[in-house]
Amino acid sequence: MLAYTYEENGKFVLKEKEKPTLQSEDDAIVRVTLASICSSDLHIKHGAVPRAVPGITVGHEMVGIVEETGRRVTKVKPGDRVTVNVETFCGECFFCKNGFVNNCTDQNGGWALGCRIDGGQAEYVRVPYAEQGLNKIPDSVTDEAALFVGDVLATGFLGGADFRDRRRGYGRHYRRRTYGNLYAFVRDA
């Protein structure tokens, strides 16, 4: 399959790679139907992300169709259209249990896709922790509209949220809700 790959500082290359396979019962393989380039991908290209691994396929903003799932994946099945969350997470470590999935301590957790493990600028992508990392796309939503859910909308929303009083749980007037990788803050009445 073709994959857009981070070769070295300053260099991305479109090259042939093997189609990914399941490595865990928690994985899914997704056929990518649409992906976008994020400024974070460009930061990798220009050496501003030291943890990025040369040789990985870049990309963490994508939608696609589930091709295969591991035994423990139950929320999606082959044939489902899905968004892929920017961050994969185990759901078990201290950070995941406290809502800070970007700091997941698992080797495949946090910002792994397209940084430390192969991402979605390819024909196929392996998604670790697919149970938490994939969200079904309703039939009424286009791939183009759904593409923004995994990173752009969530990042923008969180960036604009009121974090004045972080020590008391994101402000005393707000309750946090998590839906996959989409976060919502609800103002108490």
For the regions a language model picked out, list residue spans one by one.
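Cytochrome P450 core scaffold surrounding the K-helix E-X-X-R motif
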Residues: 40-46
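Cysteine-cluster motifs in flexible loop/terminal segments that predominantly coordinate metals
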Residues: 38, 86-135, 139-142
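Glycine-rich beta-strand-centered segment in the early N-terminal region that forms part
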Residues: 20-35, 48-97, 138-140
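Short glycine/threonine/proline-enriched tight-turn/helix- or strand-capping micro-motif at secondary-structure
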Residues: 10-18
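Short Gly/Pro-enriched turn/cap motifs at secondary-structure boundaries
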Residues: 7, 19-20, 53-59, 113-118, ...
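Residues that mark the start of a beta-strand
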Residues: 2, 27-29, 170
